[in-house]
From Swiss-Prot:
Low complexity bias spans: 26-81, 126-183, 304-345, 377-388, 408-423, 448-517
Family: Belongs to the NFYA/HAP2 subunit family.
Top-level division of the source organism's lineage: Eukaryota
Subcellular location: Nucleus
Species the sequence originates in: Dictyostelium discoideum (Social amoeba)
Protein name: Nuclear transcription factor Y subunit alpha
Function: Component of the NF-Y/HAP transcription factor complex. The NF-Y complex stimulates the transcription of various genes by recognizing and binding to a CCAAT motif in promoters.
Amino acid sequence: MNQINYLTSERNFLPPTDRDILNLGNNSSNSNNNSSSSNNNNNNNNNNNNNNNNNNNNSNSNSNSNNNNNNNSNNNNSSSSPDHMSLHSNGMDIHHNQQNHHYQNIQHQPHHFQQNYDERRIDYGNNNNNNNTNSMNNSNNNSNNNSNNNSNNNNNNNNNNNNNNNNNNSNNNNNSNNNNFNYNIKQQPQQTLQNQIVNMNGNIITSNGNHHYPTPHMLYARMAEIVEEPLYVNAKQYNRILKRRAARAKLESENKLPKTRKAYQHESRHQHAIRRQRGCGGRFLTKADQAKLDAQNAANAAAAAANPNASSTSTTTSNITNNNNNNNNNNNTNNNNNNNNTNVNGSGGSGGSNKIASSDDDIENDVENDSDSANIKNNSNSPNQSSSSPPPSKSKVVKKSNTINKRNNNINNNNNNNNNNNNEKTQPISSSSSSSSPLLNNGHIQAQQNQSPSSSPSQNLPPLNFSNNINNNINNNGNPTNFNNNNPNNNPNNNNNNNPNNNSFLPPLSNFSNNRS
């Protein structure tokens, strides 16, 4: 929205009449009068500043060319940017020279222009001719522009008329200020409910309904009508929708709806967080897992009580010793433990189900399938095999075991194969053996292996042996210590620097127990 201040010789604001507004830009002779009046103004500047007559003459020629350009642009875009003279085409330009001569002096700069400017708004639309679009500050800078016209012209001449060629806006502003029309245009946010608004075509837009302009509240009302329109469907489509709804309701009641990707991710993330919190390398513990864990703990406690050599202050240590004794006495058990160790350290489990169970029964079924994974691999007629999880192909199993054997051979070349007892203490729970759930010691996992002599020894894999320098035992603080029974400095909490077997310089391996690779 543009704003124009109108000034007469009485220094009062005189808004244009309706006839003047309707005749915007239709008088080309008026624009010519405007150019002649601006030339007179430049002559007045020369009379006031006789010292720079030559420079002023040059600047006058430049300003005349600018005036011509300005007039041409006004004539071309008379509807979008009319000059001031066309608004006062009824002989009012008789006062302009007197007025301009009066305001050449800086002491007579009227300060009430900006304070009492006209509140009327005239909309010229998007003004293609930007020569007349100065800022509001020109009303305050009239004195500077009028008094320093010569200095501005000198600057233009010193710069080889670059300013005149490039900055037509400044010359046009000087012309308007010399005429003292105070022709200040400021872009305003468009308001459609003014009493009288002139658009770029010269049509008057009034708020009394003469011109239907799309005001915001009208648009909002139409949008509300569109939103409230009902959705019409035929009977065939409606019956199809009803059938879909009924089928979905039935699946919801039976808890058989497939989870969306987002829900699946949320539940999977939640269960992984629980596993990390419990330090469990395998799957999430269910009631069946907990029952098997309790039974295993009871058996381990009984075996530890029967064996005086396995006496220890913690339940975890007695369980580990029990496993070691079983390994020494039973080759089948040792092989099974080796298989579990290999699965933990890189085989990726033994093909446990990836689905998120929707109830405890489903989770128990998955647990049973995973606990008998060796039977599923080797014997397709296993009685414990569930029909919901088909056995993997034997070629995949052979490939997996070959990969692990390669890695085990590389490790065994650097280590002692007789380090099985130490290795038994360090392995976290297998992701494939649900019955060998962990014993927790301050949140850290201690190894227990499932003993199932029914599994085929031919598919058992060799153990992963770690370096003798690092036995990777996890003590109560989660730090690696050398757990050598013959070493007197062997306290798991002992971080004595004098102990040559102490590995306190290594980073803590508490995350090792959570390795589910």
